[in-house]
Amino acid sequence: MAKRSVLGLGLGLGLSLVLGCASSPPLDLELAEVPSAEELYRQGNQHLEGRRRFLLFHSTDYSKAIESFQDVIDNYPYSEYAVLSELKIADAYFDQDLYEEALTYYRDFADLHPDHEQVAYTIYRAALCHYRQSHGPGRDQTATEQAIAQLDRLISKYPQSPQAAEGEAMWRELRTRLAEHAMGIGDFYMDREEYQSAADRYRSVLDAYPGLGLDAEALYKLGLCYSEMNRDDEAARIFQVLLENYEGSDVAREARDLVPAAN
């Protein structure tokens, strides 16, 4: 009787397995079919274009757009659509003012695809990310310096690109900001009668940021620092350079009274 019980149990289990297999769909039918790279890319663009609302306004679903583009990258990493999707994700973050996220994608694109035709664009946009996070002359200038570093790279490596032409104006603006920042620190030391520290800052403006419109002022204040430190010969030489090169400036007229030979 014990043998019949074991045999009956075995037959019962075998029958259950057969019935279970018969009632379960094949594994490949359970897996959802992944759309093509082109279709996923098209879906991402549709989410970016958004839907018209209230006649004039469009609602853009950046999250779904990024998800679609990421699906392209995950499922078709070697397709051209994957490369384009990297750019689309970067731009989607940028358009939401999420500059750190955008910056990561722009920098990675330039590093991973150094020969791609859009590299100049990504370097320029990386500079823009830093630019949008930068501050005026009176505050920390780390982002300003990072933006300039990207623009230096853009202008030196891709001088004929449209982005280089656009970047030159930004480059000049940012360098002027750094010069103004240095001048502000010089003024800070000057007000506290720390003339050597002030002179070092004014000198740095002349050495590092010439031709940005601050040369005359920097020369004048450098001369004043030397005068206050009783380095009269150096002060006279600086004032003379000021008079010879910026004769019509307001500070040159003030310096004229401080140079006996010029009167």
Per-segment meaning from a language model:
Residues 2, 20-263:
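Acidic, polar-rich low-complexity tracts and alpha-helical solenoid repeat scaffolds
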Residues 8-18:
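Bacterial N-terminal signal peptides
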